[in-house]
Amino acid sequence: MRHYEVVFIVHPDQSEQVPAMIERYKAIVTARNGQIHRLEDWGRRQMAYPIQKVHKAHYVLMNIECDGEALGELEHAFKFNDAVLRHLVVKTKAAVTTPSPMMKEEKSRSLTAAPATDEAKPAEAESA
């Protein structure tokens, strides 16, 4: 079996259906003895350019290990789902389980934002 990195972009009006879509795509991979090594829901983000007059979309990243038939079935599901604006499948040499740069950036942003809000609270208490 080969390793793949799969990213798909979902129309923002269909964001509430993303968890069900993820489960459906996971089922396609695991039904053929494939594995999901990493699954990241990046949420709604600004796109670099509009697709179908939409400027924001819901992004999902999956690192999977599967055979060609499962991959073909997955791509077929992407093509015939109107909510999926774009999808990209890239073959990788090995399984990737570490957090993606997008998630690392988001985590560091949340860590730096949290202490700043904590520091602001004592300053307000001192001025009161």
Swiss-Prot record:
**Do the record's keywords include rRNA-binding?**
yes
**Gene3D superfamilies xrefs:** 3.30.70.60
GO CC annotation: what is one? cytosolic small ribosomal subunit
| A Pfam family hit | Ribosomal_S6
Return one GO MF term. small ribosomal subunit rRNA binding
Start and end residues of each stretch annotated as Disordered: 97-128
* Keywords on record: Ribonucleoprotein, Ribosomal protein, RNA-binding, rRNA-binding
* Stretches with biased composition (Basic and acidic residues): 118-128
Biological process according to GO: translation
The record's annotation in SUPFAM superfamilies points to: Ribosomal protein S6
* Alphabetical list of InterPro entries matching this protein: Ribosomal_bS6, Ribosomal_bS6_sf, Ribosomal_S6_plastid/chlpt, Transl_elong_EF1B/ribsomal_bS6
- What family does the database annotate? Belongs to the bacterial ribosomal protein bS6 family.
PANTHER family for the chain: MITOCHONDRIAL 28S RIBOSOMAL PROTEIN S6, SMALL RIBOSOMAL SUBUNIT PROTEIN BS6M
Functionally, this protein is described as follows: Binds together with bS18 to 16S ribosomal RNA.
Task: Give the protein's recorded name.
Answer: Small ribosomal subunit protein bS6
